Amino acid sequence: QLMRRSADGLMDGSLPAEKLAEIEAVLAKYRQQGIAFHALRTRQAGSRSFVMVHVLVPGDWSVRQAHDWAERIEAELREVLGHAHVTTHLEPVEDPLSMIDQELDRPAP
């Protein structure tokens, strides 16, 4: 038991279920604004939390508008999680390639 707890402190793992629920609650508020999310990935490394998520916005939004929404989402996630490192990736919701999130290399269009 002691060795497992010691090793857990050295190994990265995903965030605990209660933190994932907090993330989902934040994202649910933004879904009501027409924003979609996928490819949510979390990691706990020591005392530091990391969150990565793809943010799908209408393709006719300006870069500024999409960026402003992404900044709001990142700030709220950091507030809820206590200074986590949050990374978002903006994608147009209409683009079928936006739905491919499992592969590191995307096929050429």
Where are these regions (language model features)?
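Alpha-helical transmembrane segments and adjacent TM-loop junctions that form the membrane-embedded core
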Residues: 1-109
